[in-house]
């Protein structure tokens, strides 16, 4: 008798995705982050669902409803902080996942890569509208500043901003629609994740060497299910430690002050995971130029498959490219730090240099290094 998991229409899909999937035998722990992202998404949807049961998307009660969740709802405080810190863990896994794909040349699977970039944009949008919901000072002013950037678009800018706001300022209509978007987007993301996996399994996983591994595959279960479980336990351990010991480490103290349109916080800044893009935005003195640079800092990822000049897929055996890759990581961290600093000397010039280096590395230096490596290997 054939096994039900190989014959049942639904089980067959799950089987070919998580059980009998042929997987390269040499993939390292850097490949754990895909499953960790899936875990983060599930945790965010579940904690978010319970928060939505008690939250009220209304300007007069939003802030107090979050306080009510933390004070009066059974274990509301842990659900709220798991959700807030879960978002941080989500972005740590996300950036690591993208970094790993860049290093090992996974971007050559173009459909998987492009859907991944679309997923990144949607997760960023979800996180942005979610940050507005507690209706603290930073929520309100973050929403005002970031949505206002659209007014830089010629002709239709101002109309577009008022259309998104649902009025002449960030108010009740804005909060309601942001809550709606924050609720619906994770489900669209889940559907896109399925498409992302579908395209990934068309070509199969890459491996650290970048060499096709068709002759050396092992089943996903039990080898990688157990490996993913270890990663999952570590992720949950770090998340719980953060949530229970330092729940506000990555938050902004200004968000514990109710939103007040009449007083502007001294430093308006987004959550830490947007600071690199915010630093790039601020480094250009022109509004439209800044907005374009902000968009390009993310959309540049779509160009990366076209900028692949190396004859080798992975950076494992390419020392020049490795050096530039780690320079890019250091530059990303520098931008993140600069985004959280006030606009004054020397932070302005450091931010501008880091922004120039970011685009220079991706568009010019890394493709050139790959060509030099090809020449050295007489390819």
UniProtKB/Swiss-Prot annotation:
PROSITE patterns: CYTB_CTER, CYTB_NTER. It is a multi-pass membrane protein. Heme b b566 binds at residues 97, 196. Its cofactor is heme b. Keywords: Electron transport, Heme, Iron, Membrane, Metal-binding, Mitochondrion, Mitochondrion inner membrane, Respiratory chain, Transmembrane, Transmembrane helix, Transport, Ubiquinone. Its main location: mitochondrion. GO terms for cellular component: mitochondrial inner membrane; respiratory chain complex III. A ubiquinone binds at residue 201. InterPro entries: Cyt_b/b6_C (IPR005798), Cyt_b/b6_C_sf (IPR036150), Cyt_b/b6_N (IPR005797), Cytb/b6-like_sf (IPR027387), Cytochrome_b (IPR030689), Cytochrome_b_C_euk/bac (IPR048260), Cytochrome_b_N_euk/bac (IPR048259), Di-haem_cyt_TM (IPR016174). Binds 2 heme b groups non-covalently. Belongs to the cytochrome b family. Component of the ubiquinol-cytochrome c reductase complex (complex III or cytochrome b-c1 complex) that is part of the mitochondrial respiratory chain. The b-c1 complex mediates electron transfer from ubiquinol to cytochrome c. Contributes to the generation of a proton gradient across the mitochondrial membrane that is then used for ATP synthesis. This is Cytochrome b.
